[in-house]
Amino acid sequence: MADYLRQVMPENDSDSEALPRKSEQASLAWAEYTANFEMGLESSKLKNNKNMPEAFLLPNGYPDYLRLILTSRVYDVVTETPLTPVVNISNRLGCKVLLKREDLQPVFSFKLRGAYNKMAHLDPRDCWRGVVTYSTGNHAQGVAYSARKLRIPATIVMPSGTPDIMHMNVSRLGGSVILHGADLDTAKAEAERLEKIYNLISIPPLDDPYVIAGHGTIGMELLHQISSKNLEAVFCCAGEGSLIAGIGIYLKRIAPHVNIIGVEMHNPKATVKSLEGVKYTTLKDAGLFARCATVKTAGRESYRIFQEVVSEVIEVTMDETFGATKDIFEDTRAIIEPAGALVLAGLKKWVSQNPSVNQDRCLVAIASGANVDFDHLRLITERASIAENKGGLHEINGVSRNEEPYLLS
């Protein structure tokens, strides 16, 4: 890696201070989303990259993500998260299954990586203005934590129905929380209004090159922690795409034989449709999970990267997801949020569809976070048990499926 850095980093000159600094240790919703985009793909490229140093752009104008990942600032605040073997599941599936434990981050989510990397690359002369973002929880906590570390005022707009555990943690971390609107699109509109009125700096939860590169450091860590020889596939939540795009673009450059598998809930099909077709797709109705965390469409930059790096997308049901939550607990005694547990559910389904006699093959699932509202633990455990015995139920003891979107935020 040192050799690579010597090749790609420009020589010291008068402009060198404007370049992203290399971390001393650099030798990743349910993913956030918004359904509304006003930009075409080309204009998106120009907008996202207009303030990026030329040395970090490829000849075609797109970001050089390998260089951005290698020079990421995330290790100012995060440590390399462990790869935890899940022995019972491995024995059951006949292969080696590992969890990448992003739930062990300071804010219990991979989102800290992207938020901090973006904010650490802001011009220090502008930071006094403060930052603003919109989120259902995990990105909000990442921004609030980063803002405290970097001493930048932060305003976070969250939907009114955001679980208490989310907005209270954001406030505890020092963020100024505004609860506004019924969904993330409404919160996004309010954040944009505040940005214009108060001249704040926007920290988007998705589709920003520095955010994607921050999440891509997860892929870099994987290849530090495990030999790529037997690594057959890495599974992560498809969502709006910044996580899988960042991990995928690094792994495909360094270990191109590794399959990148996205996992998505059965109802939100925007990601699957976008991957299967040539057009960028936005669904009119994302279905049951639309309150806070539904993915109506992948981010535009993430969608572009999808086409290059993602092998396939597996769909799983809510009951399969809750069953995987129980599997993880039995192996690790950790409660992973359903947005992270669905990845293991997808891994299990993929193994059943792709059997192999090779017991040395290694599969990695990205456990993206552990921000679960305590009040929903009962629903998770009961649904997991029912999924095992009876195949699911519409309503359990008065807790209906209408509450499920908040489990996935």
Curated annotation (Swiss-Prot):
Tell me the pathway.
Mycotoxin biosynthesis
Residue positions, PTM N6-(pyridoxal phosphate)lysine = 111
- Do the record's keywords include Lyase? yes
Disordered: annotated span: 1-21
Q: List the keywords (alphabetical).
A: Lyase, Pyridoxal phosphate, Virulence
Residues bound to pyridoxal 5'-phosphate are: 138, 239-243, 368
Name the domain of life.
Eukaryota
Q: Which cofactor does it need?
A: pyridoxal 5'-phosphate
* E.C. number(s) listed in UniProt: 4.3.1.-
User: Which GO terms of type biological process are on file?
Assistant: isoleucine biosynthetic process; L-serine catabolic process; threonine catabolic process
Q: Which Pfam families match?
A: PALP
* InterPro entries documented for this protein: Ser/Thr_Dehydratase (IPR050147), Ser/Thr_deHydtase_PyrdxlP-BS (IPR000634), TrpB-like_PALP (IPR001926), TrpB-like_PALP_sf (IPR036052)
GO molecular function terms here? L-serine ammonia-lyase activity; pyridoxal phosphate binding; threonine deaminase activity
Q: What else is known?
A: Gene clusters encoding host-selective toxins (HSTs) are localized on conditionally dispensable chromosomes (CDCs), also called supernumerary chromosomes, where they are present in multiple copies. The CDCs are not essential for saprophytic growth but controls host-selective pathogenicity.
Family to which this protein belongs: Belongs to the serine/threonine dehydratase family.
Give the protein's function. Threonine dehydratase-like protein; part of the gene clusters that mediate the biosynthesis of the host-selective toxins (HSTs) AK-toxins responsible for Japanese pear black spot disease by the Japanese pear pathotype. AK-toxins are esters of 9,10-epoxy 8-hydroxy 9-methyldecatrienoic acid (EDA). On cellular level, AK-toxins affect plasma membrane of susceptible cells and cause a sudden increase in loss of K(+) after a few minutes of toxin treatment.
UniProt protein name: Threonine dehydratase-like protein AKTS1-1
| Record lineage | Eukaryota, Fungi, Dikarya, Ascomycota, Pezizomycotina
